[in-house]
Amino acid sequence: GKSILQSSKWTYGVIPDEKRTMIANEVVGMLYKMLQEEIEVLSSHHLVEAIYSDLEEVLYKLMLAEKTYAYELSCYPEKEEQFITEYNNLNRVSLALKFMMEYVAAKPPKGEVTLGIGKYEYILAICSLIIEWAYKNDLFHYNIFNTPVEILKSDRIGMKQDEFYTIYQYGDKYRREQLYYNSSSDFHKKYTINQENYSDALDIAFQAEYGYSFTQFCRLIMGMIEYGKEREEQEVYIAPKEKLIEYIVQIDEKLSNEIAIAIIKDISLTERDDFLKVPSGFRKEDVYPWRFNRAYSFNRRPVIIRNDMIIWGNRQLYHMLMYVTDLIYEGKISTKNDKMCTLIGRISDDRGRKFNKLISDILSDMEVFVIDSNVDRINKKPVADKNGNTL
């Protein structure tokens, strides 16, 4: 708030609604400048490795929490709020770490200051605030929030928390249900949606989209993970690019040098002139750390290339593979390729039909309702909205 006031563009009091995005943009800009200044003085020596090590630790804790939540709750129901708070904090730290990693990978610092704990936490706090304010700016821009913004006499920027709390409640309820469901899946095997085998079609679509098959994509990742497993004393792995590719090609005859190089390129973050300027072929939003489902993000590109060296962690690689697979099977992966679009449409249609059957089975087993599945007409009249669109 103090920095905003010093710009002489703003004064104390409530900001007009039409200027909320303006002040949010200014806050994000100031925070981003602070981030640039803090990172550019750092030494690159072991910087990526330090961030990556923390990312691996946080991911381990997140995966553990997601697998054990239902069991922990059964044993210690009085600790539910503590579990949720810790889980949410881990997610916030993970987002900040990924943002810092994406920035450092794009703009490796050339300073001489060794990153200390205090400086590290300060930079992560800046990263977290950028994500928070930029996300709020989107909420203002799309008129999702009507919350007034006010510059307080204490030189802080204040907002009433009612709307934030309401949205948080909805998200919190969903997160708890999802955590409980995913961590107790062994207890509810009766009702499941079994996916069809799309492996052949997925290989063809992947080949058309990226120049290699999904099978080759998976095998390359498994090869890198195997390379890491042979070096169990480490958690973050560093290998010369040529040596790693030679290793993978030797243990997997299905992969060639050309394919391995192409896949590694597509799952890597590299240095570029401007962090905010997206590489060719991507949307500008793909480098915004507060946006979801970004094609050019650490979630999709957990390999860091530094000169001719490759840096990665096995947990992040495996998480990326699961993440991409989920995007495909949930119909969320961005694509302009006809074959991939056709496959995504087919998967979505199949998933919809299976979901309808699942709900029908659950209701039928209650032995209370008469269930007719896939009904599109009632008394010979189409089930449609007021515009005639079939429901």
Q: Language-model features: where?
A:
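Acidic, metal-dependent phosphodiester-chemistry machinery of nucleic-acid enzymes
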Residues: 1-369, 375
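Active-site metal-binding core of divalent-cation-utilizing nuclease and nuclease-like domains
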Residues: 372-391
